[in-house]
Amino acid sequence: MNADEWFAPQSLSKMVDIACDTAADIVLPTVSLDRYDAHRERHSRVLDAAHISIDSKSSMVAGLPQLILGGLVAQTSGVMYSRPLFEACLSRGKAYRTVEFMAYALSQARFVSGCGDACFHAVAPKLTDAFDPTMYARISDDTRALDELADSLSEADSGGRLKLASQKFYFAGLVACIENLCLSPHGVSSIERSARMRDMLEAPRTRQMVAALKDNHRGLGLLFGPIASAKPARCVMCTHLAAFLNRTGAKTA
């Protein structure tokens, strides 16, 4: 846990109770992503873990898309692992508190449970505060880990739900990278910004995602078209337009 992360009262004991009662290898709390306004009032986005129960490959295929698309798979702090599973992940060289660690743990777990009554508080990501030149590399690594998990379950996933969830995870991460590049204060020149944008848009993983989602992109927002056409200038324009519409409360999808 980081210094600005915390459990609500009794949350940890409730997670321990679930782990003991169900012999769960992984217990996921509900996560509250908090931000504070100028008046120090808290505004939260809640990722609910109440309905998570995975005890087989078929239930993994059914439940994992919810973890991915709901955002919980990326919330790697505050998760409870059994000691044998935790040590197995470390022995494979998986870095703790990464999606890679979480994905490998999910692939090895016999039972995964959510604890809706436990709430873990974390600071909501602030994409526009500062430019992060390593962000795209992390998103790529995270998606690769989810792709590998989906591949390991491909026989049970005849409908391709995990692959689709992984594609949408990558799209959301790519949009976040574009927003960080376009909207954060930084000293990056317009030439470098365009070069970074083009590298992301022309990356093989991006083109794979576009091909996979071209017939299933409803609801993905303004940026799918510019990303699909690999036009950096259009991406910049639509990013600023989406930010303006979000501030005014208008819909962008």
Residue ranges and their predicted role:
Residues 1-3:
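Catalytic metal- and UDP-sugar-binding loop of GT-A-like glycosyltransferases, i.e.
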Residues 5, 23-24, 183-253:
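Membrane-interface aromatic/basic loop that binds lipid-linked glycans or pyrophosphate carriers
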Residues 5-115, 122-135:
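Donor-binding/catalytic cores of nucleotide-activated saccharide
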Residues 59-64, 161, 196, 208:
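Exposed alpha-helical structural elements
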Residues 75, 140-143, 168:
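Alpha-helix N-cap/helix-start motif at coil-to-helix transitions, marked by capping-box chemistry
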Residues 117-126, 131-158, 176, 180-206:
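Catalytic core of nucleotide-sugar-dependent glycosyltransferases
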Residues 160-179:
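Amphipathic alpha-helical protein-interaction segments enriched in hydrophobic
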